Amino acid sequence: MSNNTDLSPVHVIGGGLAGSEAAWQIAQAGVPVVLHEMRPVRGTDAHKTEQLAELVCSNSFRSDDAETNAVGVLHAEMRLAGSLIMACADAHQVPAGGALAVDREGFSQAVTARLEAHPLITIEREEITGLPPTEWGTTIIATGPLTAPSLAEAIAAETDADALAFFDAIAPIIHFDSINMDVCWFQSRYDKVGPGGTGKDYINCPMDEEQYEAFVAALIEGDKTDFKEWEGTPYFDGCLPIEVMAERGPETLRHGPMKPMGLTNAHNPTVKPYAVVQLRQDNALGTLYNMVGFQTKLKYGSQTGIFKMIPGLENAEFARLGGLHRNTYLNSPVLLDNVLRLKSRQTLRFAGQVTGCEGYVESSAIGLLAGRFTAAEKLSQAAVPPPPTTAFGALLGHITGGHIVTDDEPGKRSFQPMNVNFGLFPPVDVPKPEGKRLRGKEKTIAKKRALSARALADCRNWLSLY
């Protein structure tokens, strides 16, 4: 440890999954931490206890398969990095097939006990009502989707009010290689060339009148989820669920997000589509496409069945399904640098769901990275981001720059929260067995295994730098 090492404490605001993991990583590096948690001084409508890292929804950390599932790869990388959250999850696992599910009370009690027992961690039970004072120095804000209103207002004032969202408007995202391009075609409406575009920036899925009418009927009849009481999010016209638009009248969608104007079917130029579903590139790699204007409150089972009615999407594989719910998060690609610092105030770092990741594991992983980056800086070391080929790096890349921001949908935010998935990883060459050509499911599994093996190898190399 060098003589100029700054051992003043790092402050972490928020004792959820991300904040707990960040505090642990910092303390394990030998740097003192003050962890601020407002519960039980101030509760939320979702939390039921005062435990740290309380799981407010499911008790599942999803698949633990580190060979063919991206979240399983993230589990494995977190274990390699000494994650507190994963250690406590493993210790309190309950049977759930191939998934990692936990005893929620035992899990959060274990996290709380480990943090309380750490000699370098001080836990302060208090509400932080504004941005931290400058004398605090380095601070991580990990306040999650239910950030207290006063702190959310302070963050909005610092970052620009338009840079902080208070709900998700999530449209489904599809893996490009599952789209049938014998039916669909590339074209921008009226062949318009936008910033960085070519005039062929959208994938178009055509419908005739009969297909359109059946699709609208299915949207109206599909099973919907209701808002939880604590979400309290009203609909507004700039972001109506697709099924609500369908209920407003049979022609609403084909004069809205499914309008066919300015498009010519490259496979059948003489036949004008009655309606068109457009897909827009969602990441810089071009491996993911989102369904334009298709934010929805349909239940997941209904979404997959109904959206596969769309011509060209019969075999679609979804990286993420749609939703609309309460969530406080930053427009991170604009506001944060590649090590999660606020560009306008670099003593502030953000972590967890407030950065625009989705899910327990993803939030914890971003907390882990924020903690490691912060500890490195406090110890006068370089904060080195993980390679984009790792699950850590793929997720970080989505948050801090991999997402394409577009201006063609006025009133709608381009950046939306995301779970980790293989579509965020750079492509990999799949090794072919000698004398054999891989096809279909066999090829898909081989590709996932290659991505997973590369990710874990590169993660080990990255961790060796710390």
UniProtKB/Swiss-Prot annotation:
This is Methylenetetrahydrofolate--tRNA-(uracil-5-)-methyltransferase TrmFO. SUPFAM superfamilies: FAD/NAD(P)-binding domain. FAD binds at G14, G15, G16, L17, A18, G19. Signal peptide: none annotated. PROSITE patterns: GIDA_2 (PS01281). The gene is trmFO. It is found in: Cytoplasm. It comes from Brucella canis (strain ATCC 23365 / NCTC 10854 / RM-666). Pfam families: GIDA. Transmembrane segments: none annotated. GO terms for cellular component: cytosol. GO terms for biological process: tRNA methylation; tRNA wobble uridine modification. One of its GO terms (molecular function) is flavin adenine dinucleotide binding. Its main location: cytoplasm. It is an enzyme of class 2 (transferase).
